[in-house]
Amino acid sequence: MKLYKVPIKPISQFATKLKGDTLFGQICWAIFYKFGKEKLANLLEKYRDNRPFLVVSDAFAMGYLPKPKMPSCFLKEKSEDKKMNRKKIWLTLEELLNGAYTQAKTDKEIKNGDKEDITIHNALNYKTFHTGDGFDPHGLSVSKLDKKDIFFLLDEEQLKFDEFKDVLELLSDMGYGKKASVGKGRFEFDKDEIEEIKLNSNSKVFMTLSPFSPKGLNLKNIYYEPFTRFGKFGANRAYKNAFKKPILLADVASVIEFDKVKEYQYLGHAISGLSDIPEYSDTVHQGYSIVLPLKDLV
């Protein structure tokens, strides 16, 4: 499998966070629309059998990756600087691979321009063009995002590189996440700026680039923050019962330690059984994550 970095430029507000597992689901729908149901079904059949055609990372500040979520003693951080260290969350790829965790920077230092806001909405009766008796205002959290990097681990024997680019282009036009039908979640990317990242994948310690399921792994240690995904069906499946069963995952930047040196490009497994609706039994969730090799923990 080949690891690619895709720089994107958001061109509208986003109402859903750019998380790898959600991105994967949206890409599956783009494959469905671009290449048909049979193509997607064949890809997902192998995906369930620990042969993922694609693993997608979260979106990160351009040129940076998240600091590993592990105890400060492994990060060589001073306990008296605990408050400041919590804000230092970004490392370059080189710093991360070399274990230079004390070089981590804050959003302000890297000039990350992400901004989150709440927009207030109200239900409108389109017959009367009034709000009605209930007066039910609600807030929608939206984000204005700076340029991002997203990593994709692609098996080109299953999904060709040109097919992947076409699918990503379709997704960028369709929009990502909540409220895409009214213009949210749009982004641009230049196909010529897609970069292949070549790494030595041998290590005892790895860091994840998206939420994943560590179930079944023979680990020495794992350091993580829990993340509960309350998923919803989208596109053609959003109308019967949109809600999926909750999934407990280890969030992005989890650190996995093994007893011996291993070679991994990704860890985790596909997650099924997300709905009791029989015709939705083929649904799978990305429980895989791209992993990067770290220095041994001392």
Region roles according to the model:
Residues 1-298:
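Conserved active-site/ligand-binding neighborhood in enzyme cores
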